[in-house]
Amino acid sequence: VPFPVNLCTLSQIFHEPFTKEKAQQYFQKVQQDPQSCKTFEDIAIASVGADLYEMFYKHYTEKQWGMPCKELDASIFSRIPIRLNNDQRYFSDRYQGIPKAGFTAMMKRMLNAKMHILLNTDYQQIKDEISYEKLIYTGPLDAYYDYCYGHLPYRCLRFAFETHDTPSYQQAAVINYPNDYDYTRITEFKKLTG
């Protein structure tokens, strides 16, 4: 079903058409007072109810963060929109797009001859040897500070690229897999780029 939660999601789950008004009534029935919510689990259940929490948020979030929702801060929930319309996009910006020639070409055009780029370089080994007005560091944050506050617990991602000889592999550009799968989502890029 479509995600983030929207009218299409509710219609498919409950097997009946949902309007904005009907969705508002549903959420008024299942919502709780968010004032005392301190964890992701608390705020998610208070916002969408226990059923939608179990269906969409709990397992996906725990898989993504590698921690129980009871241990995650409530602020994390705010990154996931809940829509009272049929918009199935994750972002709702008025203008969204992908560079016509791709991101690599865009970055090449942005580069300037006055820029000095160091790749595969340990910042700690060169920091006293370089001078700069502005520095863009793209390594681990804790490494930048030479681990003075210890190591941050990082999660890694593994991307598996596959090519399928079919006009359409799945219904939407991005489909999340919240339950017992070894992966969190599948993206069909041609649906993003047209």
Where are these regions (language model features)?
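N-terminal FAD cofactor-binding segment of flavoenzymes
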Residues: 1
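Active-site/ligand-binding neighborhood in enzyme catalytic cores
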Residues: 7-134, 138-145
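Short aromatic/basic micro-patch
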Residues: 4
